[in-house]
């Protein structure tokens, strides 16, 4: 329940969605279907420019409802690459995708802007060169997002208590996930 509350808190407490993106050429893997769906959601978001970021997060999430849950979506390739899949997802990818779409749309961005946002959100310091660069834990993802100014953790205002419990198993044992 606490994880669910944290994810909901993050989902509805998006801030700085109007901030400037670190736009760079991004190397990614996607499919024509995934790209088309992303462009469709971007167009829907850009058609409602006056909406608050939280409302746009909900809009993006509703636009993506019905896509199947697929575990291990990012482990399909032999080497680490930014994988952009909207036609299949897992829970954290869903949140990352919605946030990236909203941030790109608020900058009147295109698919490339979305890819750049996703890279910044999914990988430590926006660097995707190896499995260990990926933010594997929701807690680390949230802390990195707070550091970048893309999310605000409102758990404390909802009665949550911060626990500083370092987690690093996946990053320290990448061979266990090959």
At which residue positions do the language-model features occur?
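Hydrophobic h-region of N-terminal signal peptides that target proteins for export
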Residues: 10-18
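Cationic-aromatic interfacial patches
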Residues: 22-93
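Positively charged n-region of N-terminal signal peptides that target proteins for export
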Residues: 1-4
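Acidic/His-rich structured neighborhood in mature extracellular/periplasmic domains
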Residues: 67-178
């Amino acid at each position: 329940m606490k994880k669910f509350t944290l994810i909901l808190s993050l989902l509805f407490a998006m801030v700085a969605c109007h901030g400037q993106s670190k736009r760079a050429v991004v190397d990614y893997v996607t499919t024509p279907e995934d790209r088309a769906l992303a462009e469709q959601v971007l167009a829907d978001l850009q058609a409602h420019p006056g909406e608050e970021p939280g409302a746009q997060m909900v809009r993006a999430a509703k636009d993506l409802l019905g896509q199947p849950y697929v575990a291990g979506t990012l482990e399909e390739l032999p080497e680490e690459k930014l994988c952009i899949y909207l036609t299949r997802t897992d829970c954290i990818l869903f949140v990352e995708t919605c946030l990236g779409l909203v941030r790109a749309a608020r900058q009147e961005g295109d698919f490339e802007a979305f890819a750049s946002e996703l890279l910044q959100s999914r990988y430590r310091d926006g660097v995707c060169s190896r499995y260990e660069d990926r933010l594997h834990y929701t807690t680390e993802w949230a802390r990195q997002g707070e550091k970048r100014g893309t999310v605000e953790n409102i758990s404390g205002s909802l009665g949550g208590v911060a626990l500083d419990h370092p987690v690093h198993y996946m990053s320290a044992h990448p061979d266990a996930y090959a």
